[in-house]
Design a protein with these regions (language model features):
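N-terminal catalytic scaffold of extracellular/periplasmic and nuclease hydrolases
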Residues: 1-132, 137-161, 165, 241-242
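Metal-dependent active-site segment of extracytoplasmic phospho-/sulfohydrolases and closely related
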Residues: 1, 242-265
Length: 265
């Protein structure tokens, strides 16, 4: 907030929207096996309410017993469901909402679980291992078989969204050829790059079309963590501000539907 204020040339802070929300709480962050969690165990705790072993996705610490997420509960209750991130769609945090794997590195099998879950909308940079290192059927080929349309970038999404029954939004192919693991950092972004704001807007647009029962959407600003690992303060600040822009998109929806919308950061 202080950095944002400095960028705007003023003394003091420019508040981030989600720090102004009326309620706050605390959570324990240790995993079932470690004092310091990782994204897989933390994602599983967030998604399912169960602590598990570091590295595990959607299973208990025995690495075998599956546990369902709030996203699965919502889908089973008839709501539309979306899972979105600024990193690969099969990365630990998004995967915890739809997959079950003893290892977060089982990217191909996690990708297959994406189709098994059958959620309405997924978004991220791409699949990390779409062909199981060339040994198995392409996850891209599975998309059409499972009723999904793949869009590459926001403009492509806008062209395809009306006719699509279920949607997977990825960054443009040219961007994935450079780095399929994530969309570019906000500080490096070009006009043609997919942004978390684009992803959030697309998700809400898709999940609310042709129905009014409601939806569940998880959106992750996944590169905040990466920038922190790199001890890159400026990049971290820009990623947080970028997440705030995505929250603003969700808040716009809340402003139109205040009695039936809950935003949790």
């Amino acid at each position: 907030e202080l950095y944002r204020g400095e960028l705007e040339g003023k003394k003091g802070i420019t508040p981030i929207l989600f720090t102004q929300f009326p309620y706050a709480t605390v959570a324990t962050t240790f995993s079932a096996t470690n004092g310091v969690t990782d994204s897989a165990a933390a994602g599983t705790a967030l998604a399912t309410g169960n602590k598990t072993k570091n590295g595990a996705i959607g299973v208990l610490k025995d690495l075998e017993t599956p546990v369902n997420s709030i996203a699965v509960w919502a889908k089973n209750a008839g709501y539309r469901v979306g899972v979105a991130t600024s990193v690969s769609v099969d990365h630990a945090t998004p995967a915890a909402f739809y997959a079950h794997a003893g290892s977060r590195s089982s990217y191909y099998n996690i990708g297959k679980d994406l189709y098994e879950a059958g959620f309405d909308f997924y978004a991220g940079s791409d699949f990390l291992d779409p062909t199981d290192k060339g040994k198995s059927e392409s996850l891209y080929d599975m998309a059409e078989k499972n009723g999904y349309t793949i869009a590459r970038g926001y403009k492509d999404y806008m062209k395809k969204c009306k006719k699509a029954e279920k949607m997977i939004l990825f960054q443009p192919e040219a961007a994935s050829q450079i780095d399929r693991s994530s969309i570019p950092y906000a500080i490096d972004r070009k006009k043609t790059d997919l942004s978390l704001q684009d992803i959030t807007r697309s998700a809400i647009n898709f999940l609310t079309k042709d129905q009014d029962k409601g939806f569940f959407l998880m959106v992750e600003g996944g590169k905040i963590d990466w920038a922190c690992h790199a001890n890159d303060a400026a990049t971290t600040f820009h990623e947080v501000m970028d997440m705030d822009e995505a929250v603003k998109v969700a808040y716009e929806f809340y402003s139109q539907h205040p009695d039936e919308t809950l935003i949790v950061i």
